[in-house]
Amino acid sequence: MQRNPNPNNLPVELNRTSLYLGLLFVFVTGVLMSSYFFN
């Protein structure tokens, strides 16, 4: 991911994208774990 020729081009956009992906991953993992525990 460090092969971007312009690393300072969209730092805020990349940070927001990584943050949203992290929250989505945690949410999906929580749903899967809750389904396993409740079943």
From Swiss-Prot:
A cellular component annotation (GO) from this entry: photosystem II reaction center
Keywords: Membrane, Photosynthesis, Photosystem II, Reaction center, Thylakoid, Transmembrane, Transmembrane helix
Family membership: Belongs to the PsbL family.
Membrane topology: Single-pass membrane protein
UniProt-listed InterPro entries: PSII_PsbL, PSII_PsbL_sf
The organism's place on the tree of life at top rank: Bacteria
Major location category of this protein: membrane
Keyword Signal: no
Record text on subunit structure and interactions: PSII is composed of 1 copy each of membrane proteins PsbA, PsbB, PsbC, PsbD, PsbE, PsbF, PsbH, PsbI, PsbJ, PsbK, PsbL, PsbM, PsbT, PsbX, PsbY, PsbZ, Psb30/Ycf12, peripheral proteins PsbO, CyanoQ (PsbQ), PsbU, PsbV and a large number of cofactors. It forms dimeric complexes.
Protein name, per record: Photosystem II reaction center protein L
Any GO BP annotation: photosynthesis
Biological function: One of the components of the core complex of photosystem II (PSII). PSII is a light-driven water:plastoquinone oxidoreductase that uses light energy to abstract electrons from H(2)O, generating O(2) and a proton gradient subsequently used for ATP formation. It consists of a core antenna complex that captures photons, and an electron transfer chain that converts photonic excitation into a charge separation. This subunit is found at the monomer-monomer interface and is required for correct PSII assembly and/or dimerization.
Subcellular compartments: Cellular thylakoid membrane
Residues passing through the membrane, by range: 18-38
Pfam families given in the database record: PsbL
